[in-house]
Amino acid sequence: MANNMKSATFCKATWAIFLVALAILVQLKGSEAQAGGCASQLGNLNVCAPYVVPGAVNTNPSQECCAALSGVNHDCMCNTLRVASQLPSSCNLAALNCGN
């Protein structure tokens, strides 16, 4: 049971770090991205980084983080997660299995 919790926590943390890194990358490359609006929305999520790092002392997001998150279009977030979930197989890596 403890290993499952550690695995799930690690997987969630990995995804969170990946999404924050992706958001920063998208912000840097935003002008090159085809979906500029989505890229800009994701880029604003960098203010949420302190709350998604494993072992973070404060896991309660700031108002700034919540505002940035509320500014991300539902389809933008879902499409980003879908594309991100396909990256491991595109790199010939095992698919992520994060559990619940």
Curated annotation (Swiss-Prot):
It comes from the Eukaryota. One of its GO terms (cellular component) is extracellular region. Disulfide bonds join C38-C76, C48-C65, C66-C91, C78-C98. It is found in: Secreted. Keywords: Disulfide bond, Secreted, Signal. SUPFAM superfamilies: Bifunctional inhibitor/lipid-transfer protein/seed storage 2S albumin. The gene is MEN-8. This is Protein MEN-8. Its main location: secreted. It comes from Silene latifolia. The keyword Signal applies.
